[in-house]
C-alpha cells in the first residue's frame, strides 16, 4: 500500500 505498516493493499491507507 502506501503506509509502512501496509505491506499489502488493504483499506488502511488512501491508496
Swiss-Prot record:
Q: Where in the cell is it found?
A: Secreted
Cystine bridges: 1-13, 2-9, 6-12
What are the top taxonomic ranks of the organism? Eukaryota, Metazoa, Spiralia, Lophotrochozoa, Mollusca
Q: Which sequence positions carry the modification called 4-hydroxyproline?
A: 11
Swiss-Prot/TrEMBL domain comment: The cysteine framework is III (CC-C-C-CC).
GO CC aspect terms: extracellular region
- Keyword hit for Secreted: yes
Query: Which protein, by its recorded name, is this?
Result: Conotoxin QcIIIB
Task: Name the family.
Answer: Belongs to the conotoxin M superfamily.
Main localisation? secreted
Q: Does the keyword Secreted apply?
A: yes
Name the organs or tissues of expression.
Expressed by the venom duct.
- Under the GO molecular function aspect, what terms does this record hold? toxin activity
Q: Which UniProt keywords apply?
A: Disulfide bond, Hydroxylation, Secreted, Toxin
Amino acid at each position: 500500500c502506501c503506509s509502512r505498516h501496509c505491506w499489502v493493499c488493504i483499506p488502511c491507507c488512501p491508496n
